[in-house]
A protein has these predicted regions:
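Solvent-exposed beta-strand sheet faces enriched in polar/charged residues
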Residues: 8, 38, 190-192
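Flexible, active-site-adjacent loop/turn segments at secondary-structure boundaries
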Residues: 10, 43, 81, 131, ...
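Polybasic, low-complexity association/targeting segments
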Residues: 5-6, 11-14
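Phosphate-binding/catalytic loop of phosphoryl-transfer enzymes
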Residues: 13-110
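ATP-binding/phosphotransfer module of carbohydrate and carboxylate kinases, centering on a glycine-rich
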Residues: 1-4, 25-27, 48-55, 98-196
């Protein structure tokens, strides 16, 4: 009996250079063992839909939606944090941090969200937010992890936190509606990721 390695990897499959680099690393790591590589979202859609037709929306650090119809995969979104990822935890955190700055400036009233961010980021003065973000050095996972604060504020009916969630839900719904055009009969929708 010989095991086969099957891996679902973030970002695998879209760019040839990345695919080749990952394949080379896996050949070195697995030696003569047989292996197959797929994108993490391909594994997710297969698992979530049990190999059937439907749509899977993933909203974690980033966001993407995929539809599977007759074994054909179509994607929508998944453009990365610099170009899109609407509705993702990173996107939510970015909106939150912008609101923090607007609340400090006086453009918006200060709400619980403001105080949660100030406490979590250990800001002595409001301008320290710039240093805090710069120290994260564009680490999207660390920035995305701040989105939890939006959930805390939303549970207490913070109007800005609730608005961010409404906008995120709208963006995720647009991903689903775009892919729904591929179907003429009822279909399954599944969701995966920390935003949910």
């Amino acid at each position: 009996f010989q095991a086969k390695v099957i891996a679902g990897l973030a970002g695998y499959g879209e760019q040839k250079e990345v695919r080749n680099k990952i394949a080379t690393i896996c050949k070195e790591a697995f030696g003569n063992r047989e292996f197959s590589l797929y994108s993490d979202v391909r594994i997710a859609i297969t698992g979530a839909l049990g190999g059937g037709d439907g749509i899977v929306v993933v909203a974690g650090t980033g966001s993407i939606a995929l539809s599977s119809k007759n074994n054909h995969i179509t994607r929508c979104g998944g453009w990365g944090y610099q170009l899109g990822d609407e509705g993702s935890a990173y996107w939510i955190a970015k909106r939150m941090l912008a609101l923090y700055c607007q609340q400090f400036d006086g453009r918006l009233e200060k709400t619980q969200l403001y105080y949660l961010i100030k406490e979590k980021c250990k800001l002595e003065n409001d301008y320290d937010i710039i240093t805090f973000i710069n120290k994260l050095n564009h680490d999207r996972t660390s920035i995305a992890s701040l989105a939890k604060l939006n959930g805390i504020a939303a549970k207490d009916n913070d109007k800005y936190a609730l608005q961010i969630y409404k906008e995120a839900a709208y963006e995720i719904a647009v991903l689903i509606k775009t892919l729904a055009k591929n179907f003429t009969s009822p279909f399954k929708v599944s969701y995966i990721g920390g935003v949910f």
